[in-house]
Amino acid sequence: MPTTTVKSTDLDFDNIKASLKNFLKADTQFADYDFDASGLNNILDVLAYNTHVNGLTANFALNEAFLNTAQLRSSVVSHAETLGYEVRSRVASKALVELSVNLSGVTGRPAQIQLNSGTQFTTSVDGVSYTFRTLETFFARDNGSGLYQLQTNEGSSDIPIFEGTEKTKTFLVGETSERQVFVIPDTEIDTKTATVLVFDTASSTNFIQYTPLAEASTIDKDTTVFTIRETPNGFYELNFGDGISFGKKPDAGNKVVVTYLATKGPDANLADTFTATSNITIAGANYSITAVTSAESTGGALRQSIESVRQLAPLAFATQQRMVTSADYKAVIMSNFSAVTDTAVWSGDQNIPVDYGKVYISLNFPTGTAESTKTETQNNIVSNFTDTLGIMSIETEFVDPVDIFLELVVNFDFDPSLTGFTLTSTENSIYNFITTFFNRNLNTFDKIFRRSNLLTEIDALDPAILSSRCETK
């Protein structure tokens, strides 16, 4: 009998084949066989290939079982859900505008006018047109001279408008005791803009508006809440309660209507001029709506990346909906504010000078973000999160980040005989790569510039680059 064993941990094809060959050679029954002959060689190839594929399949499957090694988006999203983390969908770009209607000189003008939800505004970014719209109804009162300045419920004249196309999906609840799945076949949905209405029947006008689970203060069998989760194929699934202890379940025969925005995400950011596409009708006459931009559009984002989910899901689970440690603050902010690219948080005892009873937050925004947007984000963090989830005696203070700029002088040795590119095109390639390197590795907090890493990647750009040197200032 042979004494040689096959190494089960060696998954490389050539090593598997060599191991099988050595295993068979050790058996006296195959002492005179030529294992490099075409017949036996083909058989060994098949055996090695089969073992190689099976080993890789088992390895891949095991990797997908853990959040930190999973590569498929569906696996990462599934693991995040087990931690109670809501993976962010696309986010519609948001702008603030001051809207007014001038009725001066109009006799019998009303004391109050109304701007309906869904009023559209057009704009363009880099030559591409986008449509923004209101998501709620706003009112304005006559200031005495016929000017109507629209305001929010809080009394602010900054009206939020959001980019996207309004879409509606209708479902009929069937006769079944099993959990029904309501799939929204749209990868561009901004789930935060979704509204869910449940009608008594397909033809009824009576409805109940369900609210997102995150907005519910208490949950019982009669609480009308819904959730929207990402499915393995990239679409989104609408879910309701079980009707027993965790939220109300729609009855058989009910009609479910979901309205939401399908958005282009970051493409519509940095728009600063908006024009109303329609007039407002008052007493049968049409009047134009004047829009003055208070804050350019920002915050639009693609759906959350795999690496972002991998990083934030465990942190969000650790926070347990409270803000105590610096990691809690970072997890909550990064999970809820797509306009923020990075966050640094430290306590008062870590500050210089020491300042007990405070938590310091520094927010990093994309280049070009308006100051009004930064201020609004800070106010939202305080009012919606630190005041409700933080410790009462801890005061929040925001600190502007300090940008550090590096001036690089890069020299390289170039051999034109080793490439088809010219010296000028190679210089441009290196310049573009350096920009990409900084954007990828350094435009966030707690990052270190390592010159050796930069030079190593520059040398690998083209065989004609024999060596490179870098001076920093």
Q: Which ranges hold each PLM region?
A:
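Extended assembly-interface regions of large multimeric machines
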Residues: M1-D190, L455, P463-K473
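Carbohydrate-recognition loop of C-type lectin domains
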Residues: T4-K7, D12-L20, L24, Q320-N441, ...
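Flexible glycine-/small-residue-rich
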Residues: L99-L103, D200, F240, Y260, ...
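Short, well-structured beta-strand/strand-turn elements
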Residues: T122-T134, N206-F207, A331-N351, L461-K473
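Acidic, glycine-rich low-complexity/disordered segments
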Residues: G144-S204, E237-L238, F246-M323, L389-I448
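Extracellular/luminal ectodomains and secreted, surface-exposed scaffolds of diverse proteins
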Residues: T193-K248
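C-terminal structured "cap/appendage" subdomains that terminate the fold
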Residues: F433-K473
